[in-house]
Design a protein with these regions (language model features):
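Short juxta-domain linker segments that transition from a proline/glycine-rich
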Residues: 1-284
Length: 284
């Protein structure tokens, strides 16, 4: 949100010039102005009185293009996340906890789904988990220096990522179900790790990467068998319990990609029309 947009959101009660002076510390807002600004930004009043000690660039937060977040919500989330990250890192500093992030895949360029899957398998190998189910995505990634912050927000926000003091930070909505939260964490990790070639849809590659991290394609085929032309909901639910993957478009997409089910079967499992399934699968 620009200074002028913020000014407009408070019906001109604060001028862009005044906002600029507040930001530079040249002038202090009155209590009435603080209340107006906190309401406009959806932030608590104490946010404005906390000095930042951690260098975080809010402009580097990325949000999914198809999300329903308006500019006001985006700015509110950015500032909330910066505050939460700062508190998180301050606590670690007090406790003497140090972290180092060692995963570097900058020498790999993702040009399509195959490379995204290979990168996911490389990550699994580097984390020494083979093809096993991931018990806790948060615990696993925090052991290699990834900071994961959960914030309280409505369903319009799922996740985002950034860097702070040289460490990757992933932010997720604490109110999501565990399966969606796990998928979002690895989707955002894809944004942090993956370098995509020009013209490649990074959002789609991050989905492919996240799916493959959660359950490798070969493992999925081993679980359901190589030659199948159908799959039951009971089987999908068993895989859900073991691998923490929701029985929705993710699992159906994996089964469809493995040529286990047809569009019509996917539609039946998802309670959608065939055309809706086509659209859903094309987005993943």
């Amino acid at each position: 949100m620009s200074q002028r947009e913020l000014c407009n959101s408070v019906d001109g009660k604060v001028s862009p010039t005044a906002i600029a002076k507040y930001e530079k510390g040249l002038m202090m807002p009155s209590s009435d102005v603080l209340i107006v600004l906190s309401n406009a930004l959806n932030m608590k009043l104490d946010y404005f009185f906390r000095p930042y000690t951690i260098d975080i660039d809010p402009s580097k937060f990325e949000f999914r293009k198809k999300s329903n977040l308006g500019s006001k919500k985006v700015e509110s989330i950015k500032h909330l996340v910066c505050s939460e990250i700062e508190k998180y890192l301050e606590i670690e500093a007090i406790l003497g906890i140090t972290s180092k992030f060692c995963l570097d895949y900058s020498n790999t360029t993702v040009e399509g789904e195959n490379e995204a899957k290979l990168l996911a398998l490389r990550l699994r190998n580097d984390l020494n988990i083979g093809s096993d189910a991931i018990v806790s995505a948060i615990d696993l990634l925090e052991t290699v220096g990834v900071k994961i912050i959960e914030i309280d927000h409505d369903s319009s926000f799922s996740g985002t990522c950034n860097e702070a003091v040289g460490l990757p930070v992933i932010v997720v909505n604490k109110n999501m179900c565990s399966e969606r939260k796990r998928l979002t964490i690895f989707h955002e990790l894809g944004h942090l790790l993956m370098h995509c070639a020009d013209g490649v849809d990074k959002e789609k590659m991050c989905n492919v990467f996240a799916n493959e991290v959660l359950i490798p394609s070969d493992k999925f085929k081993n679980l359901i068998g190589e030659s199948r032309h159908d799959i039951s909901l009971v089987e999908l639910q068993a895989i859900q319990r073991e691998y923490g993957i929701s029985v929705d478009a993710l699992m159906v997409n994996r089964a469809f990609a493995s040529e286990v089910i047809s569009y019509s079967k996917a539609a039946a499992l998802l309670d959608m029309s065939v055309n809706e399934v086509r659209d859903t699968l094309n987005l993943m």
